[in-house]
Amino acid sequence: ILVDAQGRRFMTALDPAAELAPRDVVTRGVAAAIKAGKGAFLDARTALGAAFPQAFPTVYAACRASGIDPVRQPIPIAPAAHYHMGGVLTDSFGRTSIDGLWAVGEVACTGAHGANRLASNSLLEAVVFAARVAGDVGAAPLRRGWPPPAPPDLSPRPPPAEDAAAITRLRATMSARVGVIRDGQGLESALATIETIAAGARSPRLRAMTTAARLITAAALARRESRGAHFRADYPATDPAQSHRATAPFGPLRTVPPHPAQSLGEGLAAPPMETRS
């Protein structure tokens, strides 16, 4: 069960299913408890007790390394990013808007998950779409004569000191402004911070991170409703008129309105890079 610092369950007041409510509902409940200063804890003492080490050895070891004994103590918890349901726009065969480039897995937005992924469906998506992409790539004509591109230097190395500090700032901004509970003012503030960080980025890693952050934040700002894992405190209701995927071209991200999804068929003109939410 989930409890606050006083040992009181808080999900029972938020949803009839309590801790078994949809993951977005539970996540908002946890975030609200933490923001209110009550704290949030996973209490497995009754459900597992002495069986915890055998049932969840990895979690148990991590708790013990942090000085927590889950057999006798509730475990402090907080929301964390787990899965991104948006991504690069693809059709049902993983084709992107760039000819010859396919995307599959969490990087792609196939629409298979809707607004709130069901448990384990990401694995099913990866298996199904990987097979479809492989078949489509194998059937595609091989084009010759293109000069081989110079590979970028992506060898692992610590980022420059200024980039390391910027990464910390970017992560804090995304958690605070583009996290579980969002609003227009916070998203606008996040975009401004992201632009500042991007302007000083030196490493490919930070440039990629700011690109992803910009796209996610702009898409969240454009969707003026709450749906699944996307919750806007200033637009808490679900808008039936927005029951479709939205496309955010890579470019002027601050003013991109959502529009109905299209399939990337033959001859469809599409922006060179886009993401969906």
UniProtKB/Swiss-Prot annotation:
One of its GO terms (biological process) is 'de novo' NAD biosynthetic process from L-aspartate. Residues 142-161, 234-277 are annotated as: Disordered. FAD binds at residues 106, 122-123. The active site is at 23 (proton donor/acceptor). It is an enzyme of class 1 (oxidoreductase). This is L-aspartate oxidase. GO terms for cellular component: cytoplasm. SUPFAM superfamilies: FAD/NAD(P)-binding domain, Succinate dehydrogenase/fumarate reductase flavoprotein C-terminal domain, Succinate dehydrogenase/fumarate reductase flavoprotein, catalytic domain. Binds 1 FAD per subunit. One of its GO terms (molecular function) is L-aspartate oxidase activity. Its cofactor is FAD. Belongs to the FAD-dependent oxidoreductase 2 family. NadB subfamily. Residues 146-161 have a biased composition (Pro residues). The keyword Oxidoreductase applies. It catalyses: L-aspartate + O2 = iminosuccinate + H2O2. The keyword Ubl conjugation does not apply. It comes from Rhodospirillum rubrum. PANTHER family: L-ASPARTATE OXIDASE (PTHR42716), L-ASPARTATE OXIDASE, CHLOROPLASTIC (PTHR42716:SF2).
